[in-house]
Amino acid sequence: FDINAPVVEIGDDDFALWYRDITEEPKKYDGKTVRFKGQVARLKKDRDGYFAPGGFVMTCCVEDIAFMGLPCKYADAASLHAREWVTVEATVSVRFHALYRGTGPILTAIRVTPAEPAKNEVATF
């Protein structure tokens, strides 16, 4: 993926690498627009107006598969269903969120549209 593109396009096969990159170095994405496909996760806190698009990632072996998502502010978040596939286009900002217990990348949705599931529903490195 090209981090200097007007819209950083994250392909299905690049999700795990991008997720690690944006969570380890969020400041380099601050102010950027990103587009990626992911599954909807509902947040236990901040339910109103937020969801967490992301995917299941396997870092080592089957036992360590976990859902990795980013908090996303979206006015119609309540209309989304858990595990539904969507394409998200959003701007990135780095600020406090309880999910991180500190600062981290927060998405603000520009557009959220239904999507077909990824060919591989578990992303790997």
Briefly describe each language-model feature range.
Residues F1-F125:
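OB-fold and OB-like single-stranded nucleic-acid-recognition modules
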